[in-house]
Amino acid sequence: LVVVEDGGQGVESAKAAIEALRSSGALAKIVYVPLPKSGRCVAGNKALEAATGQLCCFLDDDDLFYADHLEVLVSEWLKQPTLGAVYSLSYEVRTHVQSEEPWVYQNVMHSLIHRQPFHRPTLWHHNYFPIQTVLFQRKLFEENGGFDLDLENLEDWNLWVRYSLKNDFKLVPKVTSTYRVPDQIEKALQRQAVLDNYYAKAKAKHDLLKVELTLPEIQQIVEEISHQNQVVGVPTSWLKQVVIRTPLLRNLYHPLKKWVSIWRRIRR
């Protein structure tokens, strides 16, 4: 386990908790990397540099692994060790933060938003991997580098696009984790605006990348897109932005989101 503290309440503010965990014997080895406030990309890259295992997986401090998360993903990867990565499903948890100090919050709703089998053209268009859902080979970091320091947002999307250029990913259709999004409309709008601003920046970086495909692989991609009857799907983020910014639709957003989540589960 590698724990990177990005600033926190002063450098090494988590040291006591780490030492207590070490002394408990619950984990064989814990690597603690305290940093001054440096940002997500620096913290993620430091974690990858410190990691020594063959497989890696990220976990932000407000996300949650279920007890079988790593077991499910590792077991699937062992069946096909040539895969660059495997990823599972995750609940998006709408969270109402009542207080940050002390930390008090309420989980408002769980929704299953992303259920997309691996498809490169779709990934080139928009991200459908919550960051904690992906278990990947560390050699991808060694071969392709880590997070792009120019991106303070959508850095994970850029990482997965680069890692998947020469490596296949595979979906494991089981929910094994959760991630949080703000419940308050104002915070949701602010968050979406930031992501929208970074989309063009991340896309511009992707346009400089090159991918090598065989003729059968190109044919397969064309057939898949044709079968879907779309060039590339309209991103969920765009639809969400339209709904939230339309007063008549705004009040229907969360009920519709819940209904769609239930309908998807029934259909599957």
What do the predicted segments below correspond to?
Residues 60-64, 89:
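The conserved acidic donor/metal-binding loop of glycosyltransferases
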Residues 219-268:
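Membrane-proximal basic amphipathic "stem/tether" segments
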